[in-house]
Amino acid sequence: MNLLDEPVTPSDAKRLILQALASGDVRFTSHALDEMAKDGITQADALGILRSGVVEPGEFVKSSWRYRVRVRRAVVVSAFRSECSAVVVTAWRIR
């Protein structure tokens, strides 16, 4: 159950992502793993992108708020399950 009042600001999303990373509660959907494999993005790469990337404003997609986290050549899309739990929905390399 998601108890967050979403959407959150990009800076709050970054704080929540860092909390999820610190607690070790970042999960990957099967879709994310498939898309990451297609682009040669490892789970470690995705976690690094979440840690160092810039968070864009949330988008409401398929009944949940999703936040793109962008670095120069890749994007990871995450959603929150709680204030300290995140799920990677998809990821891709920018070509």
What does each model-found stretch correspond to?
Residues 1-95:
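Ribonuclease/tRNase effector modules and their secretory precursors
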